[in-house]
Amino acid sequence: MSEKTYRIWNLSIGWSVFAIALFTFGSTVEPTASFWDAGEYIATSAKLQVGHPPGAPFFQMMGAFFALFASSPEKVALMVNYMSVFSSAFTILFLFWTITLLLKKLPNFKSLDSLSESIGFFGSAAVGSLAFCFSDSFWFNAVETEVYAMATLILAILFWMGLRWEQEMNTARGDRWLLMISFVIGLSFGVHFMGLLTIPAIGMIYYFKNYKKVTIKGFILANLISTAILLVIFKLLLPSTLAFFGKAEVFFVNTIGLPFESGTIIAALIIFLFFYYGLKYTRKKNLVNLNTGILAVLFVLLGFSSWIMIPIRANANTVINENSPSDARLLLAYYNLEQYPETKLFYGPMFSDIYAGQDPDEPYIDDKPKYERDYKTGKYKIVNYWKDARFNSNSDHNGLLPRLWSSEHAANYMNFTEPLDFTIKPSYRSNAQLKNRIDQFREDISDGSIDGEQYHEFLKNYSPYLNIEKPSFFSNIKFFLEYQFGYMYWRYFMWNFTGRQNDEQGQYDILDGNWISGIPIIDEIRLGNQGSLNEDALNNKARNTYYFLPFILGLIGLYFLYQHDPKRFWVLMLFF
């Protein structure tokens, strides 16, 4: 098959797959607002208002474009929902093109000279992309106004562009693909941060393309550097840029005495001059790689510039104006999700610190100062008491991998893992009344008459008299594996590859929201006798049984790919 014929087939079948996806999602689209955040996203998109942190300005601007086509106010929700329909259909299109690119890279790829080879090649790409089209979770997101449909589109575009960059990496056009990737990465911040998750996979594409001999040291370094690039963009580049704008604004207004917004304008001018002279110098000195690196950072910031919409609309005092991020400092707090409870990934407080009181050595810690404009003085003033403003959790209740951290869910944690151990403090051991109460409580525990909520209430009431142990490391690992991974990830995964019980909200019981396979002996081990289900349960419209076939085919595909192209296997595993 000639290259021209291949392009015709690739484009024609790709757009046909797009049309199938568009018809599927368009004919099943939600006509109004659905549960959770969809109603807020519809309202904030249609009128360009400020939603909950961390915001999705590019998503909202696209939603406003779709809202323009509403024939009446009653149709606004439907038209904004169509944004997800088109985003998901384009995702399937780029997935088809991604599969054809990957198939061409396999070592045993044939030239497609015969009709049967061409049908097998393009047919497999169509089956793969349409299988994703009809999968449970993707279809669900494709028909309502949520950020995940467009975020998935960004993932698909980024990975496809990474493969196109690989094709032309050492040509004159190669760097243009890198700059487009950088721009879309910046753009993803205006939709959902999950777009950044393609960076490690794209980094490994670069490594395998440029280093033909793969060593253990080089492989590990490439993975670490790719992950570091992700963290630098997410945790350093963009927060530092916002912080620079915020500090410049306060400095030039409060210290120099300039009017409001002067610091923001000066900061923007400084950044412009940095890129202008940086690009001019590197071009003059023929520093090609450094010049490309500066351009890549510039394109990330250009994509991120959709965030300018948020303070513009916040200053317009829109009806929905959550947190009112009207200047650079407030925008940084909005980006950093400062309104939500702080969580620790590797080391931090457990939920048991609610029973322990403040840390005895350092009971208070500083909060972050919050600046607001004082129009009388023409300066920014701190409006909160930030010195020693926050209670510091008891350091005895800090631990590694604090999965059991939320004090609001203490009772559920203890129901799920195990109750916390406790002993009477030495100074109260002679109190007979207290001892009797605790002995009675322990008897009730032995009888099985105490649940997590009652245990939690007991610890709250008697915590001044008790030494209460923090959850063990193994309790945290158990919760992570069984609930966070098993129930909140693996269950969703299996909905798509083995089957789904129903669309009822799961309560960690055997009746609702579980994955099933359709194979009685397997389902009965986990969910009880499936033959005794009533007609309502059996006829639930969300009930699907795939008999593990997609799951088994996926495993076979992974094994096949690993055997024939281990490099491509690792790239796809990182992306997955």
PLM features per residue range, with description:
Residues M1-T24, L112-A126, L269-L302:
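Start-transfer (signal-anchor) and selected internal transmembrane alpha helices
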Residues Y6-F35, F132-F134, H192, L230-K235, ...:
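Transmembrane signal-anchor helices characteristic of membrane glycosylation enzymes that use polyprenol
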Residues G123-A126, M161, E168-G186, T215-A228:
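Short hydrophobic alpha-helices at membrane interfaces in multi-pass membrane enzymes
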Residues N108, L115-I119, L158-W177, Y206-V214:
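Membrane-interface transmembrane helices that cradle and orient dolichyl/undecaprenyl
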Residues P57, A70-L93, W97-T98, K110-S114, ...:
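Loop-to-helix entry region of an early transmembrane alpha helix in multi-pass inner-membrane enzymes
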Residues E166-Q167, T198-S226, L231, L236-T264, ...:
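Perimembrane helix-loop-helix junctions
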Residues V29-Y41, G51-G63, L78, N321-N323, ...:
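Extracytoplasmic catalytic/substrate-binding loops of multi-pass membrane glycan-assembly enzymes
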Residues W15, Y82-S114, I157-M161, I552-Y559:
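Transmembrane-helix motifs of polytopic, lipid-linked glycan transferases
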